[in-house]
């Protein structure tokens, strides 16, 4: 079971970091098409809040209906692949929306949700899903819901600051986003390879 708990922490830290890194980077994707005003940041923050909320609800629901870590890992594979593809499709999406919608507030909201809704909602499922899985059966006394959220928040802290303070100055944004997707994909496939459901059942 120690391996399973280590995987829990790996998932929490990794995807806590990835989602916040994506939030920081999204401003660089939006600004060439919708500007860099407070409206854009309002769109970014509110969109990610909606995505988080959807992920929390779905994660909690699926953890009760399908309490298997392999299900979560498979969903994270989908979310990670989506992130890898963002550099390939965000430009035509933003160009189309900017041409069709004159209001930058509505335009940026639309673009944010089309580009980020699926992967961020999936990645936001990690914390509630793990809380739901650990609520079934015996778990160590330290692995409380509060500890799960704390570990995820530590990942978010590092994802935010490493991206803002270092990565943006070193690499093109598209390359960073693709790298985040590859990291998420590697962690998800590693989780599947460990066959975590069999380990949890023991």
Which role does the model predict for each range below?
Residues 1-202:
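Alpha-helical transmembrane segments of multi-pass membrane proteins
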